Amino acid sequence: MAPFGFYYAPDPSSQQVCSIGGNVAENSGGAHCLKYGFTVHHVLGVEAVLPNGDLVHLGGPVLDAPGLDLLGALVGSEGTLAVVTKATLRLLRRPESVLTLLAGFDSIDAAGEAVSAIIGRGIVPAAVEMMDRLTIEAAEA
């Protein structure tokens, strides 16, 4: 959807190799979940096959359709309740600009406190990722 100016906000970490069906089954998400939520927050509706073979349609054209949240129960159930065959998703417009910031901290606690302070001031970053020394060394190897 990028050529049309839209994107799928949950941004699963495995986005290069995953499928929407897998995202729905696992309730996947990545670094953007802090601001935009997980897959369950972007699934408007599904067509699914129940274990007995019945075809069901859950959800509707808007998020938070009235009634029991069977859709919410299905998303993330890892295929134990049904197999999703179609999904209607909420897409977001791509932002006009993106700013990336890299900051170093003396400890994980200090980094966590900085993130808390930023969010406490009403700024919710689109994504936050943290790597400790061991992870950085592994990534650089």
Question: Which residues does each predicted region cover?
Answer:
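FAD-binding subdomain of flavoenzyme oxidoreductases
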Residues: 1-131
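Glycine-/charge-enriched secondary-structure boundary and capping motifs
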Residues: 129-141
